[in-house]
Amino acid sequence: MKLIFVSNYFNHHQLPFCDALYELLEGDFCFLQTQPMEEERVKMGWQAEERPYVRYAAKNSCAYKSGGEKTPGSESNSNAVTGAEDFEKLLFTADVVIFGGCDDESYIQERLTAGKPIFRYNERLYKEGQWKAVSPRGLLQKYKDHTRYRKAPVYFLCAGAYVPCDYHLIHAYPGKMLRFGYFPETRHYEAGQPFNHKEPGSILWAARMIDWKHPELVVKTASYLKEHLEENTFHITMIGGGELEEETHRLAEELGVTDVITFPGFQGPEEVRAAMEKSEI
C-alpha cells in the first residue's frame, strides 16, 4: 500500500509518526512538504531531522526556482525536490493520501474529483470563536472544501478535542471524524519518574505569543496568585515568543510579577519536553 502524507512542512510533531509509517509500509510512504518553513518556526527548533521519505514540492517553493537561495527549513538535497508532474502523479496514484496543514486545495482536487480515499486532518475551524460560523462567505468556502464531500470517501482526522464540534456546525464528515493529533516520541520511564523530580510550585506555559494563545492570561494568573497566596510558592516559566512577546513582558512589569515569571524565549522541542518533565503544572 502506498501512502502519501501532504502538509505545509515536516516537523518534530510528525517525525515519530512518519517514521512508524515508513517502517510499517516497508518504504511505501512519502511525506510531501508544500512550502519552506517560516523563520519564526525555525527559531523555535521546528526543523526535523532529514528523512529519506521526505519530498519537497517545487510548486510553491521559490527556493527552487531559477537556482535561487534556499529558504529556512528547506531541504539541502535538491534531489528531494518533486516537480509538479511528479507530485501530481504521486497524489493521484497513491492508495491513501493524508492531507492537512495546507490551504492549497489544488494538491488534492484531481483525487477528490476521482472519488479516491483521502484522510484530511486539521485543528479547529473556529479558533477565535464559533460565531464566525454565521459568515455566508465563510460557509460557502467551507461547503466547497468540506461539506460537499460528506458522502465521498473523505474522512477527517481531528487534531484536537473540539474539532468535531466545529465541523458538526457545517454538517461535514458525518460518522467519519476520527481522533488524531501530534505524536511526540514515546518514552518509557521507570516507576515514579518523572514525577519525583518535579520542582515544587512550578508552572509551565509553552507556545507562540500570539492573540489566540492568550499569553496575557498567564501573566494575569501570576498576578492573582501573587495577591492571594500568603507566600509566593510558585514560579511560572513562559517559553516562546512572537508578535505579543514585548507586550507580554510589559504587562508582567506593569503587574509587578517579573519576580515570579521567567521568559527564556524560544527553545527547541527537547528543551521544552525537559521543562515539561520538571514542571508540576
Language model features with spans:
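Conserved donor-binding/catalytic core segment of Leloir-type glycosyltransferases
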Residues: 193-224, 237
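Acidic anion/phosphate-binding donor-loop and adjacent secondary structure
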Residues: 183-201, 274
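Nucleotide-activated donor-binding/catalytic signature segment of Leloir-type glycosyltransferases, i.e.
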Residues: 249-270
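Short N-terminal targeting/anchoring amphipathic segment
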Residues: 2-4, 85-106, 119
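Short beta-strand->alpha-helix junction loop in the catalytic core
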Residues: 162-163, 179-190, 208-210, 243, ...
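Active-site proximal beta-strand in glycosyltransferases
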Residues: 4, 96-98, 111-130, 157
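Acidic donor-binding loop of glycosyltransferase active sites
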Residues: 277-281
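Membrane-proximal helix-turn-helix segments that form the acceptor-binding/catalytic region
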Residues: 85, 126, 135-156, 165, ...
